[in-house]
Amino acid sequence: MLIDVKNLFKIYHEGEESEVRALDGVSLSVDRGEFVAIIGQSGSGKSTLMNILGCLDIPTYGDYHLDGVDVTELSDRQLAHIRNKQIGFIFQGFNLIPALNAWENVELPLIYQGVPASKRWERVEAALERVGLAGRADHKPTEMSGGQQQRVAIARAIATQPPIIMADEPTGALDSRTGKHVLEILHGLHEEGSTIILITHDNGIAATAQRVIRIADGHILYDGDREGAFA
């Protein structure tokens, strides 16, 4: 089991007496090599859940083990190490650094990892080729379309060779044709052995996953195969 979450809560306080339970007793597990879609409307708790699964945030209480490690007990430095080694992130807003070109954006997490220059070259080149952008390596984000920027973000996510890819609404800012291409890349990565966790509000996109988790008001309403998710 790669991810194991039990009785997870994330509570925000508004004033002295009011509280919002973004996550309210969530439990789930993800095996290595699964393709899981977490679906829900805005405010459902799906992005909060991804932030905790991705070690970008910590729960108010509850248990979370990632590859056997209790991440709720880790320091900020240790969480950053896990993010850099274990997880590749893809966001709806791309989150590329405007001053850097495509090559430099993809290379940056490898520099943080301390990967030698020769290895960095190999990995960046392979990642950009994987997403079909080797010919745009010297282009900055403002010189690329939204779809190209998202493919650079995918290249950045896979360059570190993480076992887990977490994608938060990766097609949300794209047209349908470009979004389909991005999904094809994610499915290709899954076929090569990556564990994919996809956050979406779109039933059609969620239906391409092996497994669907439907969340609303901080609760899991459905967790099972895609055939039963939309019955």
Question: What is the predicted role of each segment?
Answer:
Residues 219-231:
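Conserved beta-strand-loop-alpha-helix hinge in the C-terminal portion
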Residues 1-215, 220:
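ABC family nucleotide-binding domain
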